[in-house]
Amino acid sequence: MSVTFDKKDDNVVVVIGTGPGGGVLASELAQKGVKVVALEAGGRHGPEDFVNDEWASFVQISWLDSRSTSGDWRVAKDFSGLPSWIVKGVGGSSQHWAGASLRFQEHEWKTKTVYGNVTGASLLDWPIGAKDMDPYYTRAEDKLRVTRTGGRKGLPGNNNYKVFEAGAKKLGYKNVHTGRMAINSKDYDDFVACQQTGFCFQGCKWGAKWSAGYNEIPIGEATGNLEVRINSQALKIEHDKSGKVTGVLYADADGKEHVQKARIVCVAGNSIESPRILLNSASSMFPDGLANSSGQVGRNYMRHMTGSVYATFDKPVKMWRGTTMAGIITDEARHDPTRGFVGGYELETLALGIPFMAAFLDPGGWGREFTSALDQYENMAGMWIVGEDMPQETNRVTLNHDVKDQFGLPTPNVHFDDHPNDIAMRNHAYKQGAAVYDAVGATRTFPTPPYPSTHNLGTNRMSSKARDGVVNKWGQTHDVKNLFVSDGSQFTTGAAENPTLTI
């Protein structure tokens, strides 16, 4: 049911962003009778619109606005204008995610207590824990129809997984399976089971993979309490003399500016845009940015310790067939400092098409050694490494006043330096990943550097004390009581697990 709210209606809740955080929140509020206006910077695409072409899809759904990078991380060298790969559109990055849906482990909520003082890291215990989150995890798993939870069967393993599983078992790994995935393993109502056509990063053409865009938003809209305004870029959050937020200034598709009044504002623009909006909302009352009395807005940016390992074999694997992320090894996700680092990591199968493989296998690579790897694409298997990176106050999102966007506002700069713990963990993971493939006869292995970040975390972190973060355990900002954050920027620490289920 379509609805349009008056821009002067100050009884609405404005949600900025419609991804896993904002989209679900907007829909849930609408179902409870709350009037919601969701401002979405991008357009709207459903399964019928997605294209099975990696670069065409990248242009179709990605957030490509101007951004800059700094720091010693490899991404700043290889992709200086693309620090992250996120979606600009209804559903946010749940449109292109692989679907891995994992719970934090108990110790990962209390890393300051468990890991102790790690030099150079700004570790902090979350103000919530496993017991608080378990019932919400169960609700989320049911909503997302996560496989291998709630009695739901797992997805079948493709060839990429079979190679991965065989190598894992030869190494003695015990916890290897086809993962907990927000991808239908059977038909549900109007959503079919996964058809194993692959290329999940380009959007699910069947609608079998959960997305806030086509699973949650339509439910909220059907109540008559949710209006989604597409191509509406939030520019600034306004407040009154008491410091209470009163609305959001945004620009429409034609660049015309509007103000939507609100009684509550929820920021859910991902961990780069959310702090950027708060910083761009600076005023005489909030000179360092809205809700930033602690100076923590933008700080403690995390993106997970990542990398990939690919391998070639003497027989075809055809890794692109079936789900992009078809299996997981969780044995290394434990906290075991004897390995030379705190925290842990997951190994997850991954498949890229030839266009992406050419760009990401060895950025800047050339010559026969590089091209011969691509020649063996049909015989290639692949995995992604994802582990807990250390929060650091100096890893942060700031405003780049030298580069303005199409609306005349400073663009975000993402600064990231790898912590020594991240480097030690990545090297360990490269070794173990290669060993998995060597155990089953790999002819070559290829440790691959991190891609532009898909797991953007921190920058508005959750804390018990106002001085240590930006929001409390409810996502409510410490400084402004009717301003909330509802995305991965709340994360106090990153854990080893993919973040969407927790968001």
Predicted features and spans:
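Conserved hydrophobic helix-helix packing surfaces used for dimerization/oligomerization
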Residues: 13-15, 36, 265, 483
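Glycine-rich Rossmann-fold phosphate-binding loop(s) that bind the pyrophosphate
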Residues: 17-19, 41, 488
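Conserved redox-cofactor binding core of oxidoreductases
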Residues: 62-63, 76-77, 113-234
